[in-house]
Amino acid sequence: IFMKQIFRIPTDKSYMVAPGQSIIITNSAIDHTQTAMNAFEHNLLNADFEAKDQQGKTTNNPDVPALELVYTAYAAISNMNLSQGGPGGIVIFETEEDVANWPLAYNYGKTSGNKWMKLPAKYILDGVDVLKNNAQTGVDANLKRLYDYIDAGYANINAANGYNGEVMYRKVQSTTEDGRKILSDTNNSLSDFAISSEIAPREFK
């Protein structure tokens, strides 16, 4: 899998996520309700990790641990380069290898330009394909970036460009007797994810 960026949760200590719990990873761990004019912004002061902007264009929170940047294809971009509305693929992987030594490659058929890091697919634990919803033609499934065995479907928001408060969230499949939420994981994001403009960080439904 060709990756434009790879981040790692810090290895200075063990960061365990208990069953039914979650972590928040953001580019800017601030109270966005105080800085934005949009009612759909959230307070992210309690985020668990933050992708720090080494160029200083994004406001960072020194009290939130830094997400470790392992690789970026763009010298001027050190935080998470996510496209509002898509397209893009996001994966979680685990390996004991030295990721920094993985090979780099140009785009297929190219001999210049940005280089992508080659992630062995065998290390991928989960992934979601995020596709753009074109206002005129809808979602083009031919633009999927992940293999079907990682994500047989895709997720998308309704808006074409984002910035309208819509988020994609993984749906609750069931709830245990003690109240713990078990999330849907069929390896098909069309079934596993839904869209909301009201759900809050760390909220499940």
Question: Which residue stretches match the model-derived regions?
Answer:
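A recurrent domain-boundary module in secreted/ectodomain proteins
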Residues: 183-205
